[in-house]
């Protein structure tokens, strides 16, 4: 090996660097070295150069910067793919007469790992990860991933890796056979491995699939279909891995590519790609140019209930020490046990401090109130905290409905107040609504966004308004579903229709899970504020009868052994409500229920945009997907609305009951 590598002979995004008898093919396409058209062209050219240079005995594929190839360029997927496509790159690697080793640091994902699988060997740094996460985008690997992977590890394990979309860390990857070696220094380690092959090719296409244990594979297939809710991509994942050991190599390869192309062009894949880009767009906030986040190295939380405990667990899991305060000391022991149960071994118990004194929060960089949803209670607490915490500390409210500006007004410096609306369970749910008050300082908002990333949340900024983005839209949806009770449907019929669309749960099942008293308390608050008592009275009657949902064994449904079932008593209350309102019930079909429910969501989402509560349609899609069980494969309510026939959507909006405002469908354009 030369002490000083020779300078590159070709330009970015791919170049060949000579170092002794090893040619390093360097992918330099920041930030993630995506396998774009330019990279594909460059790889084929560099492989040809490697093959034609008699002074080079072997090649090494390596990424510049922080990663190997972390995936394909998704921006290309919405149009016909330009040649050369990824299979041509794979073929060029296999056709190269000299051994080629993939040197992996950072991540080799999707098409990046498929390129590594085409190589004659794979070496990686200990902290590298590999994986085939194409299912995230509603597709399967399209360049041999499902055909080559079962030649390194058994088909059941391969299916698990493909269907979970998980990133396999190098030590596990080595144990499973996904890489050949873990090295301490990537460049010299890869070069040494390449030369150790002594010119021999080790193509996976020349190997048979690993022996198959039928029972293990069928178990993995059942799990994959359940995980993917039998969506088309999940069915094709199973079929592709089955072909890998049942069909000839090239036949399996050709069918995999055909399925990939078909799924890539599907509505579901387009919706999932939309969500991928929406998450990145959500971080771009007007007015934050140059804003520097404040350092947050310790967190205080007031309120040791389920929500406060979940928030504490989320921060502890992210490595931040937490001080949890509740003015009722008897609640703290239960909270500590709850947090420990949430975390298991994810964080050291010593990182959690509990106290019944607000003064314990004085050193914290961020203090979050997670107390009862009552304006006076929250204002009083913020007023007291304002005199305890440091002047440069951030104060946050976990309110899910209330006016953040009114809460912030209780402090001497509203600029340091921001809304951090977590969703229960807070250590699990991906969504974090960040509420920007009228006086919230840019640095405080920037800090909240940075914290959202640190917690692994999908953070979306909302303006101030009752219910912010998500709860406002959800309330409109729930109101319309209750109106359909009067019109002629029953809770189980509405929930069944909604769940058939792909929602995790229908609105009445959700209400039973969260507690009818929660919904009723919010409804009473709004009635007091607006004087509007037009809501369907069934909820009020259920609460008055002590039917609060799952926690009392009865709500919209009856619960026996934890299983929900329709309750004739609820049907009787619905009939009573119809009689009181003078409504003659009509049969509502599943499609009618679905159309009205979706139209209610779309209409309120359009109004949220119109009122400036959400910055962009894609932010609303993220909120409904990550916090409210909206079907991910539909891409969110406004993405879905854009794909619908405009005239039919207009008719569905017109059919909504008791609508006070109509959203403008032109906003979809």
What is the predicted function of each stretch?
Residues 2-14, 28, 40, 80-88, ...:
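N-terminal glycine-rich phosphate-binding loop for ADP-containing cofactors
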Residues 102, 106-112:
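Gly/Ser-rich catalytic serine loop of serine hydrolases
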Residues 61-62, 69, 77, 102, ...:
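Redox-cofactor binding/interface segments in oxidoreductases and associated redox assembly factors
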Residues 66-70, 109-110, 402-403:
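Short, active-site-adjacent cap segments at secondary-structure transitions
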Residues 1-62, 91:
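Conserved CoA-thioester-binding segment of acyl-CoA-metabolizing enzymes
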Residues 38, 66-79:
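Amphipathic alpha-helical interaction surfaces in cytosolic regulatory modules
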